[in-house]
Amino acid sequence: SALENKKRLLEEELQTQYEKELYDILREWRMEQSQDLGYPPYIIASNKLLVDIIKARPKNFEELEKIKGMGRKKTKEYGREILLILENFSEASD
């Protein structure tokens, strides 16, 4: 299906094992947020946004906010947790 193709193409953008694991961790985090807040996961972050975050590797709120699809509101709401995940995971994998 078109949706499966889109998903496959997105996942092909994740080159390294590190990126693939980080993608899984971010998806897990998104699912928890989704359950806590009662929003569907894609409202919190699309798969594309998760991939873009992984590719950009933002180090602070300013860099995170510049990623297309994040914006000020999402950065304010989820930024701290996203940056924490990125920081913790990069240390673990070095």
Report each predicted region and the residues it spans.
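Accessory DNA-binding and partner-docking regions appended to nucleic-acid-acting proteins
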Residues: 1-94
